[in-house]
Amino acid sequence: VINGGTNARERGLSGGKSELALASYFGRINYDYAGRYLFSFNLRADGSSRFRKDKRWGVFPSFSGAWRISEEKFFNVKPVSNLKLRASWGQLGNQSIGSWYPTIASVSKENVVFGTAADNQILYAGYTQSKLGNKSLEWETTTVTNIGVDLGFFNNSLSFSADYFVKNTSGILRSMVLPLSVGLGAPNMNYAEVQNRGLDLEISYKGNIRDLHYSVGANVS
């Protein structure tokens, strides 16, 4: 028993032990046709010992595609050296909860007093449930959709990029708020959702003065 004594002199050992296992599998397929049509497909599976066996694995796909219009034969706009349209969609999982065993009830050491003041109130070491578990806990999932365009002018000396994205995070892992009358720590739950949207713009210029090469850029989100 770790830290099982009622006072410091009775404790011969102190410490703790925790175990966590993670396993991941990942695969990717890329396709490139004549430098004009670009596709990529990814699939990953992650397993965490934080979850029960029926909730342990999460599968997260993603794919992206691009069309380099500037490589098409019909495209003949001399100042434009690069024009590419991009789109992507993908998912990722999160299992970082802070607790190593969130699906089971936690037990902690508590001292219990027996007797009265006349009996010197003998102090005994005991254990009691301190936190509720959640058997249905599963992976938090983030889904990102992105649409973008890349432009290059004058042999790509001047470049411009624009991206619009939507990021949805569902099943966010958080502790619930319980009334104090429950008397136990709140379990972790998949009960929150957040959506973020944004637009990223970037412009850059690169050149040289004799042997001096330089580049400048700016971005805004």
Q: Where in the sequence are the language-model features?
A:
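Extracellular/periplasmic, surface-exposed regions of secreted and cell-surface proteins
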Residues: 1-221
